Amino acid sequence: MKRLPLPLQPSTFLQVLRSARTLGLSLLEPVDYASRVINNKRRLPPVHLRREVGDLSSFESSGGEFMAYCKLLASVHPGERVLDIGCGCGLMALFFEDYLDTTGRYVGVDIQSRFVRWCRKHISSRSPNFKFIHLDLPSQRYNPRGNAKADFCIPEEDHTFDFIFAKSVFTHLLPKHVERYIAEISRLLSEDGRCLASIFLFTGGRTEVTGTQNHLSFEYGNDTCRYQSEHIPETAVAYSESYIRRILSHHNLVLQEPIRYGTWSGRANGLSFQDLMVITR
């Protein structure tokens, strides 16, 4: 009797799908490169890397939007020391490269090694005050073979950074990694430092995050965190606001008011899509 093939695990299926998409996008590389040259955008990462961090059509506009938040909400200055957690393929690094002066410093951290390699080759090579670190943290969605321990440390000295940025990082983390990143933010933030982070927050029960008015629905999980996908939770994660406040307080951090709630939950007057938090000591 012929054996039926075993079904693919969700994480394996995702890797196969990703590889196929990357192959397809790689066929567009010559056209994309020509377009970047013609439009004087050679600094942009290639199309297959840009697609990994979001919608191709909004890659640059998203960076511009969040650069404005960095200035307006967290008062970042050109001479400051900046840590970008989840730097991806260098979206915000490109904006900070234009903004920071020679006394400023930028460190980007990401769990995907191909992003870090590209940023080192194309950004650090021309801007020596820009450094990129690969943090091999396991993630079922983004780095399934990662082997960093749960008590990982970002290899930088205590109280090093004036500004820490975490765009769409907590939205893809499970609780143990959220708590560890917050501990690292507390360790690395200077006395007068600020952190700007985007997140999905809920204050009520299950109906708040599964309602029909929501642009995202978090059907799975518990009262602390809820997931959009049962099989690959890191696809999108929402957290109880009280839980986040408690973890911040435990690490001697303060969530500045007001939280700028986003439109993801159906709010018509949200500042951005995700909720925005400014964190200080």
Residues covered by each model-derived region:
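Short catalytic micro-motifs in class I SAM-dependent methyltransferases
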Residues: S168-V169
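A conserved beta-strand element that flanks and buttresses the S-adenosyl-L-methionine
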Residues: F165
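Helix-capping/helix-break motifs at membrane-protein junctions
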Residues: L174-P175
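Conserved beta-strand/loop positions that form the S-adenosyl-L-methionine
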Residues: I85
